[in-house]
Amino acid sequence: MGFFSSIFGTPQTSEEGKFDTLRDDGVRAMQMGELPYAEKCLKAALELRDDDKTKAFLAEVYLHMNQYDAALPLLEVLCAAHPDDKELNLLWAQTLGKLEKWEKQRDVCAALLKTDATEARALYLSAQAEKGLGDYLTAIVHLTQCTTLRPDFHSARLLRAQVLEAMGQWNEVLADTEALVETNPENEEYQFSHARALSHVGREDEAIQQFEAVLQLNPFNREAILCLGRLYESTSRRDKALKLYTEAIDLMPDFAEAYKARGGVKHQLKDDAGAAEDLKRSLELAPE
């Protein structure tokens, strides 16, 4: 190749070189967290050449950006071209779940399970879709299979607890949340789910301790504050409820529900003026 050819290349080489440069720059940008630039490079590369590997990189960028609706059509095309690629199809199913496309997610998982009935991730994602569709019994079956195959699949155990909660099966919920808290006592979501289960089976003192532990981990957990406050009130600890709501309002002055709850406690304590003021503030923050 002559000197000028080595610089400028033939038109074909130039086109190929541009594609490679854009793709490689896009991948490097993705790895560095420069996601908008990565998207720009990879889209430009695909305008030059239809390439599955580049589509996969672009889909990955969109997933990192939480742009699931943009990733989905790319994954659909890739899975149609590579129907036997298990990891790709699992990613497709997961993305469908992010977009709450439950029926399609269930269908994709059914195809995966037909190929491998012991694929725990497909069982989990199928159960996620079944929960979304209200098919709780099938979801429980799949999640039980999943946790039997992989006892350390904590997301599956948590999802089963959530499905059982939707069914009102609180004793069964408690069994799962106890196991989760044992595996990771510092996990806020596990602690919160366990506290809710304890409160629903009538173990109020333990539930109070558990909600207090949640707030030790995260004092900004609004739902935990309201649940704990209701427990304080139901066990005649109105002074603690009042203190809890006041501290929450100090931390989060826009916490309308805390104003409303504190107003209710003040009313029970015969502080009608204070109750009216809190209710007014609650309505200002969140008009009903």
Language-model segments: residues:
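Alpha-helical segment of the N-proximal tetratricopeptide repeat
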Residues: 15-47, 51, 57-60, 64, ...
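Short coil turns that delineate tetratricopeptide repeat
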Residues: 49-50, 83, 117, 151, ...
